[in-house]
């Protein structure tokens, strides 16, 4: 590979790495926002259940009915948010691995190595 094409390839890899890091930051923000939203929904569900119990204790049928309706809605939202949070956590882990791989490839390229080559094996810490 010529020196000029190596520089061009390194530049393209750096640009791709920057885009990946921006995407990683956005994924982390989405994960954190979803986590916060999930906690709010759980708090709301606890409040609704407490109100339903209080309404049951005083025989307020309308409030009991409304509490049951809101319990169902919050429970459904919680289930969706839990799945969403799990998917976002997997996405963040995936993008973190990909970003680390891209960084390693870029370092190998900058060091004059083949970016497609596997990273060098760690030396065996145990002597023979």
Question: Each PLM stretch: what is its role?
Answer:
Residues 1-119:
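Extended, charge-rich alpha-helical scaffolding segments
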Residues 116-128:
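Extended cytosolic assembly modules
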């Amino acid at each position: 590979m010529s020196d000029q094409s190596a520089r061009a390839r390194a530049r393209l890899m750096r640009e791709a790495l920057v885009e990946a890091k921006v995407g990683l930051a956005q994924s982390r923000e989405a994960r954190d926002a979803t986590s916060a939203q999930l906690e709010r929904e759980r708090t709301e569900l606890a409040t609704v259940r407490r109100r339903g119990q209080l309404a049951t204790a005083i025989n307020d049928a309308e409030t009991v009915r409304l509490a049951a309706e809101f319990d169902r809605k919050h429970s459904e939202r919680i289930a969706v948010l839990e799945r969403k949070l799990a998917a976002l956590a997997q996405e963040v882990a995936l993008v973190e691995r990909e970003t680390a791989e891209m960084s390693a490839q870029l370092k190998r390229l900058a060091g004059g190595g083949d970016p497609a080559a596997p990273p060098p094996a760690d030396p065996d810490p145990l002597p023979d």
